[in-house]
Amino acid sequence: MNNLEDLEKKINSELTTKINNTEIKHNQLYIEIDKEDIIDVTLFLKTNQETKFRQLIDVTVVDYPENTQRFKMVYLFLSHEFNQRIILTYSINENEVIPSLTSIFPAANWMEREVFDMYGVSFKDHPDLRRILTDYGFEGHPLRKDFPLTGHTEVRYSEDQKKVISEPVKLEQNYRNFDYESPWEGTKYIKEEIENNDKKN
C-alpha cells in the first residue's frame, strides 16, 4: 500500500479493537496501542501483504517521570517494498514487564537489551536480558531523567591496588551554577549606541 492514508484506513479497519489512535505527521504513520496488543499488531504489520513492515529499525523509550505511566515505548518499523515507516507506541508503568519482540524480529534482541540497560524496562521471554552498554555491576539506568549527572560510582584504575576499582563519587566542591552575564555581553556603551542609532533612523 503506497498511500499513508489508505494504510491508516486499512490498519484501523483490520485492527479495530487493538488501535487506540492513529495520526499521520512528518510523512509517517503514528499508531498508539496497549501493551497487551504489541505482538498481534506487530505480526499483522509484518505478515500482511498490504503492509509488509518487515524491518524493525529501533526500539526506544521516552521517560516522563511526572506521568502515572512513566515510560512510553516507541517501535519504528520500515516497509522496504512500500517505502513507508510506522511508529508504534504505548505507555507503561515504571516496573511493568512487557512482551519481547525477539520471536518476531530477532534484531529486537540487542535493542531490548539497550532499553533494559538504559531505562530498566524488562522484557518477558527475552532470550538474554542483561546489560549491553554499561559495565558489570553498574548501578542505575543512565537515560532515566532522575539519574544523577555524576552517576553513583566512579570506575577507575588504582595504581595502589593495580586493578580497576569502583567507588562512590566524591565531589571536591559543591555544584556551582555558572549562569552569569558575560562581561562581553550587554555592556552599557553598546546599548546606548544602539539606542542612539535607532533615534537617528
Residue ranges and their predicted role:
Residues 1-201:
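Terminal low-complexity/charged segments
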